[in-house]
Amino acid sequence: MNVGIKGFGAYAPEKVVDNAYFESFLETSDEWISKMTGIKERRWASENQDTSDLAFEASKKAIKDAGITPADIDMIIVATATGDMPFPSVANILQEKLDTRKVPTMDQLAACSGFMYSMITAKQYVQSGDYKNILVVGADKLSKITDLTDRSTAVLFGDGAGAVVIGEVSEGRGIISYEMGSDGNGGKYLYLNKDTGKLVMNGREVFKFAVRIMGEASTRVVDKAGLQSDDIDMFIPHQANIRIMESARERLGIEREKMSVSVNRFGNTSAASIPLSISQELENGRIKDDDTLVLVGFGGGLTWGAMVIKWGK
């Protein structure tokens, strides 16, 4: 059985926050932010928008694109680090919003690697033969956990959501190879402060980890797929920082024009990062049926996930 993406959808909130916004209360500038991160603007959800609301908008599009109805969904997996509340899960809340059957629901917390973790998890369930249409969502409202007094992190984060329906696809298409991993020793470098409820990051250590693991994991999944770098049509890394992305691209040996860059528009949206990039490239006609994509993410934990996927239903 070939398992892949049967339907796709993404959503970014309407509010655009450009770099000039931060100049009024932080010692920073548009020039510095752009040079160091590649970010020009990001989207922030409104105060009355929860993560589940972002997930709902993306999910409706994915279900429609798959040519099915909510009644056909037989599992929901949401990757998020910013649930509406500790429980019930975002997946549970999303089930009600979509009015699906009483199917199993779960959230997966692997921070920015969450979308990769959830897609790989869904693949296993479909491969078992017990499930046919699994809704996987990467959604985060990072604006609610961003410390706006911290110059090093305040400018980085945005909000958004992306969703896919994972199921059986045509011969020769779908997920070809994948890898997941974690290193709990790095948990202290990127975490949510339990007292303040705000994100804390050791940028230098996270940068070192990300540069190494994104390149290594991407290379391994390409090798596992029996492919060469020349066989890759599009490289879609987690959109954390343009310098990290460029380093990973160089390690993989991919031409610059084959790398998706959406960090300039959305900032770091955690679990939504990779699907928002996919959405951009689909809109621009840069992803076509039977294209070979490499997706790779890293995040708090520290965690990582990568895959090679042949695009198409």
UniProtKB/Swiss-Prot annotation:
Keywords, comma-separated and alphabetical: Acyltransferase, Cytoplasm, Fatty acid biosynthesis, Fatty acid metabolism, Lipid biosynthesis, Lipid metabolism, Multifunctional enzyme, Transferase
Name of the featured protein: Beta-ketoacyl-[acyl-carrier-protein] synthase III
Enzyme class: transferase
One Pfam family linked to the record: ACP_syn_III_C
Annotated stretches, region: ACP-binding: 239-243
Active site: 112, 238, 268
Keyword Transferase assigned: yes
